[in-house]
Each structure stands twice: as structure tokens, then as C-alpha cells.
């Protein structure tokens, strides 16, 4: 099933006629040599295309015409898709053609959950993603300290203690190598961070410091902080961290956007630099200083839909009333975002039963449920879309219950409530997404990080019954939207699609919970038109349909059969608005 967005299930998608069009020739890297100007042809009366894409297998994500071999584009939008015979009338003086030579085209890929500027910033910081040994962790910090000015903050992130056996890092690991530089290293999930002793001293975090509501200071038996702060406790340190300049943030956006284009990403849903333990002003500063600047100076490279902290819902409402939701073809105002719990890796996701590896720990409510309900009620009543982070089974049920109550109180409308992650669901909860018309915004690649550790935290039975229930969500008619949560996981939609289809973790030779694998078509739909619909962007993009923005990706394969079976293709070229922006 494909969900309540009314895209029918397609079986045997490509007819023999389409396959006859697929060439076995290899398409070299696309560049200006592959464009030809068709000046010798007499322009037809009427509309002339700027660009004609021909001789390929074009998957449209549009149920009215799932496949075509050609596509005509004008002024950044799609004129028509179909056979070359039906499109050649758009050829005129100045029409440019790209011959796909049998290659596959898909709509521009949409990442439904990113933190774009955070990702761009992290690319220039101490990158600890994939580090699998304590010595390697410490060496990377030491190298950063040696290249930094005395007293400057050493910032980084991406570490995952499960990669080196589960032992949590502590300030003692890095104190000797960073005596004069405060260090702040965020775990890959964004819900835990390591501070060295100097950073703790600057922030005034001592043994007598109380745990804040919605957060935990990890402590030694003596009561002294270990250096690890979870969720809201991170706010004890973040105000002391050096403020990142406007220029650094602008450069982070450009760096992140260029990287996204290499992965075929043309649109992102940006949840902002908003995490437990951060101020709700960061998202607004980035909007004012970075996004509006990039948009007005025509420096945007990918389309971005912005979500803002739910505590600022009235501010977003005022802005939407003044400007509308579409600020430009590049910049869109989405809705509001909140958190109810933490993360599995930080043992702060909220569950009905305790964590096996930390007895008497059920996780955290990182926001008071009554306050969250009040904010949600007000934001929804004003017409704003609401997206709430929920990972644990209890957290998801709390949000499902709250959404149901809010919808009943505020009346019927097309609200498209979102739950971000929907990672662990109690029996029966997956069906409620479809019943309540709630978007399940999920990140398949997270399961690759969790597969080895979730049984240790929850037990094998709970892990198998509750974790990443993608097919169950589809069976319940939920709208499934795929994303990465970058920089928590890499921004790589083709890899996410492969994970959703295969569910084979690293070093495994079999699928984890194979019954929850989804079909290739469902995964691709969830990364295109469903992702657009999940953010109210489906009238603008998400499918290669006449009138929509001409965002598309050319892949490295000539075979739809192989692509749909192995999902092993790579990105050859990325087009945004009919213009090639990568390579």
C-alpha cells in the first residue's frame, strides 16, 4: 500500500515498449558537450521549450503517467512529459536537448527531515562520525586542539559510542589534551553532548548542579559530572559556546546545499538548529541572517521548507499572514516543531517499560505534556502545521492521543499533523497514523545504527515488535515520508531508499525485521511526492507533472529492473528548475 495520498499501487511498472527505449550505452558525465541547440528546425507556433530531455526512462511519481521517455521544460517548469513524438512540437529556436541515452530519471529527491545549517557547520568541525575506537576519538580532538588558538572552543559531533562497544566517553578522556580549550562534542543523535572539564567550569556545572527539567547530568558515583549532558541539560553549556558568526552560517548553508546536490537532493524540510538544550531563537536568526539573505541575493541552490520552534508559533503565524507560505520558488514557510522525548542512543526516548541497560530509566519528557498540548492546540487552531519529535513507544502514543484530541476540539481540516521519527510503536499504534491522517516522517538509515544496540536497550522481543515499522505504517494507510535527520545520519536518499527496502545493517548478512521491508516503489514515492505532500508542497514539486518545478535527477543506470532490485545507482546529474546544478 502507498498510503492515503491516493497514489495507486503499481505492479509491473514498465511496459515492453518502454524497455525497448533503454539503450545499453553508458552515459558519460553530463556537461555542456551533451547539449545541442536545435537551431536548424523551424520553431512551431506557440510555446517553445527551453530544454528537452529525451531517450530515457523517466519515472514521474505521477499516477496519471508513471513513466515517459521524454520531458519538455520552459522557464524552470515542466511543460509536458510523454513520448518524444508528442513533445517534439515544443522544439524551436534555442531549445536545448539532453539525450539520456537510456539512463533513468527520477523527480528531485526530497529529504523530509534535515538540520541543514547544523550539517553544514559540522562539515567544518571535528567530524566523529564512524569513529570506532577511543584512541581515534581522542586523537581527532587532540589534532583539533593543536590547530586551534588557546582558549577557543573545540566544536564537533557525530560520535556514536555503540561503534566502540557502548562505553560512554567522559571528560577524563580529553582533559589532558585540551587543558586550555573548552570542548563540546555532540553525539550523533543530537540528544547528548560531551564537555571537557574546562567547558563545565566555564558553564558552572558542578556536583551540586541540579538536573534541569527534561534533562540529565551524567554523574560519577561521587556526584561529580562525567562531562556528558543529556537533552535539556545541554542548555547548561550551550549559552557559553562561542556564537557562530553570520558569515560562518551562510557558508554552512552553501556548503550543505552543494553537498545535498551531489546526492540528488533538490528540496529539504529543514527543522532548523533547534534541539533540546538550544534556544528557540537560533532558527529565527538563521531565517533572517542566512535564508533571507541567500534568497534575496539569488544564492539558494536547493529548495527549503522551514519549520520553527512551536513556542514561537504566533511569530510564524504573523509572518505567514504578511508574506504567505511561499516566499519564493526556493524558500517556503512550513510549520512548527516540538519535542516530547529524547533518543534511543542517549537512553532518553520515552518508553512504557524501562531500559534493560539502565534499570528504572524509562526515558525523558523533554517538554511538559500540558504545555506542549496547549501550544499544539493554539498553533493548530491558527492553521499551522505541527510536527513533533517522538521516538519511544510511550512518546508516540502520547502524541497520537494529543493530536486526536486537538483535531476533535478544533474541527476537521487538512492539517497533516506530523510525527518525526515514529521509531518505536506499541502494538496497534501504527494503524492510528492512517486513521488520524498523521504523517509518519521516518529516517530509515537510523535503523542501521540501532540494529546492534536496540536489543541491549529494550530486549529482543520489544526490539522486533516495535522498531521501524515502515510496512505496518503503510498497511495502516499512513502517509510515509522519508528523510535522513542529517547530520545525525548522512544525507543520501538513494541509500535511505535502499535501507527501507533491504533493512540489512552493516556486517549483517540478513534483513533486520524483514516483515517491515517496503517495496522499492513505495520507498521512492516516500522520497518524492509523499515527502512533498507531507509538507504541503505537492502542488509545487515532488513529481514530474506539467506545471510543476522542473527538479529531477539523472541516475547512472540504464536498467529499471536492476535499479528497483538493488537500488545501487548513483547520481550523475541534478537539475533544479531545469538547470544543471550538479556536477
Swiss-Prot record:
Query: Keyword Glycosyltransferase, does the record have it?
Result: no
Q: GO CC terms on record?
A: membrane; perinuclear region of cytoplasm
Q: In which tissues does this protein get expressed?
A: Expressed at low level in seedlings, roots, leaves, stems, flowers, and siliques.
Induction info: Induced during germination. Accumulates slightly in seedlings upon de-etiolation; triggered slowly after irradiation with far-red light (FRc).
Effect of gene disruption?
Answer: Reduced inhibition of hypocotyl elongation in continuous far-red light (FRc), associated with a strongly attenuated disappearance of XTH15/XTR7 transcripts.
UniProt-listed Enzyme Commission number(s): 3.5.-.-
Q: Does the keyword Membrane apply?
A: yes
Keywords on record: Cytoplasm, Glycoprotein, Hydrolase, Membrane, Transmembrane, Transmembrane helix
Root EC class: hydrolase
**One Pfam family cited in the UniProt record for this chain:** Amidohydro_3
One annotated GO molecular function is: hydrolase activity, acting on carbon-nitrogen (but not peptide) bonds
Q: Where in the cell is it found?
A: Membrane; Cytoplasm, Perinuclear region
Q: Which SUPFAM superfamilies match?
A: Composite domain of metallo-dependent hydrolases, Metallo-dependent hydrolases
Kindly list the biological process annotations in GO that this record carries.
de-etiolation; response to far red light; seed germination
Q: State the annotated membrane topology for this chain.
A: Single-pass membrane protein
Glycosylation-annotated residues: 55, 374
This chain's function reads: Required for phyA-controlled responses to continuous far-red light (FRc) conditions, including the inhibition of hypocotyl elongation and the regulation of XTH15/XTR7 expression.
Q: Which family does it belong to?
A: Belongs to the metallo-dependent hydrolases superfamily.
Stated name of the protein:
Protein LONG AFTER FAR-RED 3
Q: Which organism is it from?
A: Arabidopsis thaliana (Mouse-ear cress)
Amino acid at each position: 500500500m502507498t498510503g492515503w495520498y491516493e497514489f495507486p499501487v503499481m505492479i509491473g511498472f514498465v511496459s515492453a515498449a518502454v524497455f525497448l527505449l533503454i539503450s545499453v550505452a553508458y552515459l558519460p558525465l553530463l556537461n555542456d558537450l551533451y547539449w545541442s541547440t536545435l537551431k536548424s528546425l523551424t520553431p512551431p507556433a506557440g510555446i517553445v521549450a527551453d530544454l528537452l530531455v529525451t531517450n530515457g526512462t523517466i519515472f514521474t511519481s505521477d499516477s496519471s503517467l508513471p513513466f515517459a521517455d521524454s520531458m519538455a521544460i520552459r522557464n524552470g517548469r515542466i511543460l509536458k512529459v510523454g513520448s518524444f513524438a508528442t513533445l517534439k512540437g515544443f522544439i524551436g529556436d534555442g531549445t536545448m536537448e539532453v539525450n539520456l541515452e537510456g539512463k533513468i530519471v527520477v523527480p528531485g529527491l526530497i529529504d523530509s527531515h534535515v538540520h541543514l545549517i547544523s550539517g553544514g557547520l559540522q562539515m567544518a568541525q571535528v567530524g566523529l562520525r564512524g569513529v570506532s575506537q577511543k584512541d581515534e576519538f581522542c586523537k581527532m580532538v587532540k589534532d583539533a586542539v593543536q590547530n586551534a588558538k588557546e582558549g577557543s572552543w573545540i566544536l564537533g559531533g557525530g560520535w556514536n559510542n555503540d561503534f566502540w562497544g557502548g562505553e560512554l566517553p567522559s571528560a577524563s578522556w580529553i582533559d589532558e589534551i585540551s587543558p586550555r580549550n573548552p570542548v563540546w562534542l555532540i553525539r550523533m543523535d543530537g540528544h547528548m553532548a560531551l564537555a571537557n572539564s574546562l567547558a563545565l567550569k566555564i558553564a558552572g556545572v558542578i556536583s551540586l548542579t541540579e538536573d534541569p527539567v527534561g534533562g540529565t547530568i551524567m554523574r560519577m558515583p561521587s556526584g561529580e559530572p562525567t562531562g556528558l549532558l543529556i537533552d535539556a541539560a545541554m542548555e547548561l553549556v550551550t549559552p557559553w559556546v562561542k556564537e557562530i558568526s553570520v558569515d560562518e552560517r551562510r557558508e554552512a548553508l552553501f556548503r550543505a546545499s552543494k553537498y545535498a546536490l551531489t546526492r540528488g537532493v533538490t528540496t529539504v524540510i529543514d527543522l532548523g538548529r533547534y534541539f533540546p538544550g538550544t534556544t528557540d531563537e537560533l532558527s529565527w536568526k538563521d531565517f533572517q541572517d542566512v535564508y533571507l539573505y541567500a534568497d534575496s541575493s539569488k544564492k539558494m541552490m536547493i529548495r527549503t521548507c522551514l519549520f520553527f520552534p512551536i513556542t514561537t508559533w504566533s511569530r510564524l503565524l504573523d509572518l505567514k499572514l504578511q508574506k504567505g507560505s511561499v516566499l519564493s520558488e526556493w524558500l517556503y514557510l512550513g510549520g512548527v516543531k516540538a519535542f516530547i522525548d529524547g533518543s534511543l542512543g542517549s537512553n532518553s526516548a520515552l518508553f512504557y517499560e524501562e531500559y534493560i541497560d539502565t534499570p528504572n530509566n524509562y526515558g525523558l519528557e523533554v517538554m511538559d505534556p500540558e504545555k506542549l498540548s496547549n501550544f499544539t492546540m493554539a498553533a493548530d487552531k491558527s492553521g499551522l502545521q505541527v510536527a513533533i519529535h517522538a521516538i519511544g513507544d510511550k512518546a508516540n502514543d502520547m502524541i497520537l492521543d494529543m493530536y486526536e484530541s486537538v483535531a476533535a476540539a478544533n474541527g476537521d481540516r487538512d492539517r497533516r499533523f506530523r510525527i518525526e521519527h515514529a521509531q518505536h510503536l506499541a502494538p496497534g499504534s501504527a494503524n492510528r497514523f492512517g486513521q488520524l491522517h498523521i504523517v509518519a516522517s521516518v529516517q530509515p538509515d537510523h535503523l542501521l545504527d540501532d540494529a546492534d544496540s536496540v536489543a541491549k536497550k529494550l530486549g529482543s522481543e520489544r526490539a522486533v515488535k516495535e522498531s521501524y515499522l515502515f510496512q505496518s505504517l503503510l498497511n495502516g494507510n499512513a502517509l510515509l515520508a522519508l528523510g535522513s535527520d542529517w547530520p545525525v545520519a548522512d544525507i543520501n536518499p538513494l541509500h535511505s531508499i535502499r535501507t527501507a527496502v533491504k533493512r540489512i545493517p552493516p556486517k549483517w548478512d540478513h534483513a533486520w525485521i524483514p516483515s517491515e521491508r517496503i517495496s522499492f516503489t513505495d520507498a521512492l514515492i516516500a522520497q518524492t511526492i509523499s515527502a512533498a505532500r507531507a509538507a504541503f508542497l505537492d502542488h509545487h514539486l515532488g513529481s514530474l507533472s506539467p506545471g510543476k518545478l522542473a527538479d529531477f535527477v539523472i541516475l547512472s543506470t540504464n536498467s529499471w529492473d536492476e535499479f528497483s532490485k538493488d537500488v545501487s545507482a548513483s547520481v550523475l546529474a541534478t537539475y533544479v528548475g531545469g538547470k544543471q546544478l550538479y556536477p
